[in-house]
Amino acid sequence: MADLAKIVEDLSSLTVLEAAELSKLLEEKWGVSAAAPVAVAAAGGAAGGAAAAAEEEKTEFDVILTDAGANKINVIKEVRAITGLGLKEAKDLVEGAPKAVKEAVSKAEAADLKKKLEDAGAKVDVK
């Protein structure tokens, strides 16, 4: 029991960076992911409440081009401006809709990109 108390004391004295490094080392050593038990615990609880909480906490969004609309040239120009892609790559993305224009962006940036693309004539989803 004294050994466990010593381990608790040692862990309590770790800095945040040291704790993160310890977590990574344990994940590698044991072949597990620290995120998995949290997700399972959330799913095991009140399923409806957990889903609503996950929806509220979402911080990264994907901007999906669902349809280029009638004004495809303006949409291609806007996609090029947003992504920095070349003309051919932007054209392929627009013609291959539905496709992700940008992934893992903030809510504000996703709303801004959606407005720009819709102003150019595209139909856009934010997920």
Swiss-Prot record:
Any one of the GO BP annotations: translation
Gene Ontology cellular component annotations, sorted alphabetically: cytosolic large ribosomal subunit
Key word Phosphoprotein present: no
Keywords: Ribonucleoprotein, Ribosomal protein
A GO molecular-function descriptor: structural constituent of ribosome
Family to which the UniProt record says this protein belongs: Belongs to the bacterial ribosomal protein bL12 family.
Complexes and interactors: Homodimer. Part of the ribosomal stalk of the 50S ribosomal subunit. Forms a multimeric L10(L12)X complex, where L10 forms an elongated spine to which 2 to 4 L12 dimers bind in a sequential fashion. Binds GTP-bound translation factors.
Cross-referenced HAMAP family: Ribosomal_bL12
Function: Forms part of the ribosomal stalk which helps the ribosome interact with GTP-bound translation factors. Is thus essential for accurate translation.
Protein name in UniProt: Large ribosomal subunit protein bL12
Protein species of origin: Sinorhizobium fredii (strain NBRC 101917 / NGR234)
